[in-house]
């Protein structure tokens, strides 16, 4: 288990999972304390700003980066919830919202969407696959991460800021491909198309910029996987 902590925006916690996954033999690993929603960024630094806090985007970014780099799961935290902030209790680290209300913050809701996405496909088959991303993939806070099922039945690619990326679709072993955009903010799925074509393809997410992260699913259309977040 690793602790990527609360030092800065865009800290690539996937690097910890990537390191652990490369060990032999690979064992389960996860981020036991990623950036907490509503936590002041870098609260342990002398020049900390009480205004600059991690939001739902920060928590989503940490979840997808870690999971697609090989983590076996993920944890979520909220600065107001862990200390059960309520009237009469002294706030720690500038907590400012009652813990009951913080249970319904956007990041908390979106962690459920993360879970539903990965549980809608055989999650344990996923293997990190940076090699399927071609060319100069976006770096820094816009980093793109990808993982592919060991049997080639599906792949999941996360563009942290909606930047375009190019994929080698030959890693998907299928007669016909289905491609889906998944909105990690609201859990909506948008069927891009089904195709018989292979080879390299560049994808441009529907929106871009900080907070405009998108997930692309490329899969074997004949597997009959449900749309992520669809009613069971």
Q: Residues of each region from the PLM?
A:
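Short strand-edge motifs at loop-to-beta-strand transitions and within beta-strands
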Residues: 201-203
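Substrate-binding/catalytic cleft of secreted carbohydrate-active enzymes
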Residues: 1-64
